[in-house]
């Protein structure tokens, strides 16, 4: 505090810059993290980066049926949705405490 009860603007600015740096580091860490989603009891598995990029899809041969492609398609979509949910949880865990200190910064779900 400065004389007269006014906040020290340089200290507030330094604190905001530090919080911004921490948030940027957490966002980069999140983008480079990997999560796994699955469907059909693990018959279809998806690996996704925190950025949302799908990096691998593994399909158990037991679920491949040329006469029932729709089931396989549904399982792939389900596994991707599960991985996306895991990214959301990870983002909330890593970014939530930081963004909360900055008023949420308009980040959905935080």
UniProtKB/Swiss-Prot annotation:
Compartments annotated for it: namely: Cytoplasm, Nucleoid
Role summary = Binds to DNA and alters its conformation. May be involved in regulation of gene expression, nucleoid organization and DNA protection.
Extract one GO molecular function annotation from the record.
Answer: DNA binding
Provide the family line: Belongs to the YbaB/EbfC family.
> What is one GO cellular-component annotation here?
cytosol
Instruction: Show the InterPro entries listed in the entry.
Output: YbaB-like_sf (IPR036894), YbaB/EbfC (IPR004401)
- Subunit relationships: Homodimer.
What phylogenetic lineage does the species belong to? Bacteria, Bacillati, Actinomycetota, Actinomycetes, Mycobacteriales
Protein name per UniProt: Nucleoid-associated protein Mkms_4993
Q: Which UniProt keywords apply?
A: Cytoplasm, DNA-binding
